[in-house]
Amino acid sequence: MSAVPSVQTFGKKKSATAVAHVKAGKGLIKVNGAPITLVQPEILRFKVYEPLLLVGLDKFTNIDIRVRVTGGGHVSQVYAIRQAIAKGLIAYHQKFVDEQSKNELKRAFTLYDRTLLIADSRMPEPKKFGGKGARSRYQKSYR
């Protein structure tokens, strides 16, 4: 039995982490075991579709994508998912298709939105003493 060609990539946003498994298949795209069409709300679903729509859905009829995402909120998870999918498509094309198609995908993703391939490293600033947040201070009384 021959192994199915597959790659595994990850995407991150704040504390959300998504791991995408891209392999040869029949065009299934699942997020946490559910079809991608069930991602709610609709605006966030379109964000998840962006990497696929940029280069055309017809190119991915022979690729299965399964994404497992944990941590963070809804929006952070969606951005982690789209990054994992974009990186997975590029890794799959580099490993199993050809270098030229990989470069075309990479160029299209970078021109559209750099965060599809490069993680946003910003994190919340830690809370300090003397206030209720990172920068805010408790009110001072002079008498």
Swiss-Prot record:
Keyword check for Acetylation, yes or no. yes
Listed as disulfide-bonded, the cysteine pairs are none
Q: From the record, what ranges are coiled-coil?
A: none
Tell me the GO BP annotations in alphabetical order.
Answer: maturation of SSU-rRNA from tricistronic rRNA transcript (SSU-rRNA, 5.8S rRNA, LSU-rRNA); translation
Transmembrane spans: none
Q: Which UniProt keywords apply?
A: Acetylation, Ribonucleoprotein, Ribosomal protein
Where does the signal sequence lie?
Answer: none
Q: Where is this region: Disordered?
A: 123-143
GO MF, any single term = structural constituent of ribosome
Q: Which residues carry this modification: N-acetylserine?
A: 2
Q: Which GO terms describe its cellular component?
A: cytosolic small ribosomal subunit
- Please note every region of biased composition (Basic residues): 134-143
By sequence similarity, the record places it as follows: Belongs to the universal ribosomal protein uS9 family.
NCBIfam families under this entry?
A: PRK00474.1
- Which PANTHER family does the record cross-reference, listed alphabetically? RIBOSOMAL PROTEIN S16, RIBOSOMAL PROTEIN S9
Give the protein's recorded name.
Small ribosomal subunit protein uS9
Which species does this protein come from?
Maudiozyma exigua
